[in-house]
């Protein structure tokens, strides 16, 4: 295959490309390497632990689909599952919205505010 097509999955917070970055910074299609871009618009505040959880989940999802053909559909399924995982991290408070982001649109739901029952009359 002289000019392979670049397969990709793009959601609001997850971009997966079937390819790798070369020395010139160009994305080169590949059937062997997946490149993951998490939260490209910096909508969330991240810590290293949360990022590592996402990378481990990504590896787990890719491993679970090993043996299947690398298709747009299969790649989008991994991306969609990873997007749902990010939502769960947000709901658990492991990541939070970045209020200094270019756009604050609460795409995964309005932030929850804890209410102290003792102060409610």
Swiss-Prot record:
Signal sequence extent: none
EC number: 7.1.1.-
One of the record's GO molecular function terms: oxidoreductase activity, acting on NAD(P)H, quinone or similar compound as acceptor
Key words, A-Z: Membrane, NAD, NADP, Plastoquinone, Quinone, Thylakoid, Translocase, Transport
Major subcellular site: membrane
Membrane topology summary: Peripheral membrane protein
Class of this enzyme: translocase
InterPro entries assigned: NdhM
Disulfide bonds: none
Entry similarity comment: Belongs to the complex I NdhM subunit family.
PANTHER family the UniProt entry points to: NAD(P)H-QUINONE OXIDOREDUCTASE SUBUNIT M, CHLOROPLASTIC
Subunit text: NDH-1 can be composed of about 15 different subunits; different subcomplexes with different compositions have been identified which probably have different functions.
Protein's recorded name: NAD(P)H-quinone oxidoreductase subunit M
